[in-house]
Structures are given as structure tokens and as C-alpha cells.
């Protein structure tokens, strides 16, 4: 699928990402409310078994709990909705990583479309993350803030950037246009 040329591979990845349906989960939506069609979705397992409530039973009016499927490879973990809907993405993410940041090990990928999240820490992440953004947009750099409040712009547009989001406060700079991003991380 990819050929090793970062700009060309980002165009291919953008085409893949543009085919997905984006709908942020409740916690991600609270962090950054978005318009329909935009959002942030997790690709990787989760400890949360509960997914949503189903439609009320006609006879009893009780709404059943709909739970995620167990991850067969991880005890006590469940498959994210994106893993179930788009299982082919794992190989795509691994191939992209192998070409462009081959020594980085990841277990999860956060997929974002027009998700201009404000300052935050990635409390659940373990170690460093790699972020890369693609699309036709201006602005939208990944901004990091050091302990003294100094802000540094990381140009993540078709350019992988690595930092520890669990220890370094960061956000997406305001942008205009269509912006997709991937955050590869361990959890």
C-alpha cells in the first residue's frame, strides 16, 4: 500500500482515513465537542466493557446493556468499536509505522478528523507517542508546553513527531481546512 515516500504515503493514509466514520466517545466528546462527521476514535483495546444501552424491550421497557467483545489476545480487555468495524487497519498502521518510524512500538492508535483538542495530558498513555497529521489545512501544528509555560510548535503535517504526552501538556493549534491525525501510543 505504501512506498516509503512520506508525502505520498500520507496521501494514501489520508484516503484511508477519509473512508472512516468518526464519532467521538463520551469522554473524547467532553474533551473536544465536534460537529457531526468529525471526531476522535480509538483503535486498540479498552478496559471498558460497556458500549451503550440498546432500545427498550417492547414488553418490559427495559433497555439492555450492549457490551463490547472481549479481546482474545488480552485478558480483561475489550475490542474497541473501530477494531471490530475496521480490523484491516492494524496491518495498514503497522506498514505505515515500518516505513516512517520503524523503531516505535505501539498498541493503540487514536484516529482524529478535524479534532482541535485543547491543552491536555494523555494520562493513560505509557511512554512516548508519535503524532502525524495529514490533509489540506493551515495551522494545526501540535503544540507542546514545557513546565515554565513556553510553547513549542511541532510541525506534524506529513511529519511524524514523537513526545511523551503523558508528561508534556499539548494541544492542536487552531486550524482551517480538513485535518486528519493519527496518534500511535502504548496503553
Residue ranges and their predicted role:
Residues 1-161, 166-187:
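Fe(II)/2-oxoglutarate oxygenase catalytic core
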Amino acid at each position: 500500500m505504501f512506498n516509503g515516500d512520506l508525502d505520498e504515503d500520507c496521501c494514501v493514509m489520508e484516503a484511508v482515513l477519509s473512508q472512516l466514520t468518526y464519532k467521538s466517545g463520551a469522554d473524547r466528546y467532553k474533551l473536544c465537542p465536534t460537529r457531526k462527521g468529525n471526531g476522535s476514535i480509538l483503535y486498540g483495546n479498552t478496559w471498558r466493557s460497556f458500549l451503550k444501552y440498546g432500545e427498550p424491550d417492547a414488553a418490559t421497557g427495559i433497555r439492555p446493556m450492549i457490551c463490547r467483545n472481549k479481546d482474545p489476545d488480552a485478558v480483561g480487555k475489550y475490542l474497541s468499536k473501530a477494531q471490530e468495524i475496521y480490523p484491516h487497519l492494524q496491518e495498514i498502521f503497522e506498514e505505515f509505522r515500518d516505513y516512517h518510524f520503524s523503531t516505535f512500538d505501539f498498541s493503540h492508535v487514536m484516529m482524529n478528523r478535524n479534532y482541535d483538542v485543547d491543552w491536555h495530558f494523555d494520562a493513560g498513555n505509557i511512554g512516548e507517542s508519535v503524532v502525524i497529521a495529514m490533509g489540506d489545512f493551515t495551522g494545526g501544528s501540535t503544540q507542546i508546553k514545557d513546565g515554565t509555560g513556553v510553547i513549542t510548535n511541532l510541525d506534524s503535517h506529513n511529519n511524524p513527531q514523537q513526545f511523551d504526552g503523558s508528561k508534556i501538556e499539548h494541544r492542536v493549534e487552531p486550524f482551517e481546512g480538513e485535518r486528519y491525525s493519527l496518534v500511535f501510543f502504548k496503553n
